[in-house]
């Protein structure tokens, strides 16, 4: 597998206070991912891998097929967006990972997802 510059991934996270319970060490975050296909041919997302790290350094790995129950085809010049969630035990944490994808010819490649922060807004100065 190779990393491909043909696909761009952007992530934005938000704290979900209404579903969180700090007294029970439960902090809920939603994250919205936008995947843009900058190439000249269609690609398909087959799988995902996430490394979720809480504020104590405890790591959780999550992997599986597709995202939110789909294995989307993303046309040349197109984009795919989805929202999912993560629950951690601390008010600060991070996520990072990669997507396993194939191009129109079935050749596999990997798209790295850079680290992004999960943070309760009142903790960020």
Swiss-Prot record:
InterPro entries in the cross-refs: ApaG_domain, ApaG_sf, Uncharacterised_ApaG
Protein name: Protein ApaG
Single GO biological process annotation from the record: error-free translesion synthesis
HAMAP family, alphabetized: ApaG
Record's signal peptide: none
Domain of life (superkingdom): Bacteria
Domain annotation ApaG: ranges: 1-125
Coiled-coil ranges per UniProt: none
PROSITE patterns reported for this sequence: APAG (PS51087)
Listed SUPFAM superfamilies: ApaG-like
């Amino acid at each position: 597998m190779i990393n491909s510059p043909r696909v761009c991934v952007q992530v934005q996270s938000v704290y979900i206070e209404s579903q969180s319970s700090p007294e029970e060490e439960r902090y809920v975050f939603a994250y919205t991912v936008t995947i843009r296909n900058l190439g000249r041919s269609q690609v398909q997302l087959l799988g995902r891998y996430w490394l979720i790290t809480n504020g104590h350094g405890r790591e959780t790995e999550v992997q599986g097929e597709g995202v939110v129950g789909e294995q989307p085809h993303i046309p040349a010049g197109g984009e795919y967006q989805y929202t999912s969630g993560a629950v951690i035990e601390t008010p600060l944490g991070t996520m990072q990972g990669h997507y396993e994808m194939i191009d129109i010819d079935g050749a596999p490649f990997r798209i790295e997802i850079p680290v992004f922060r999960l943070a309760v807004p009142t903790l960020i100065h």
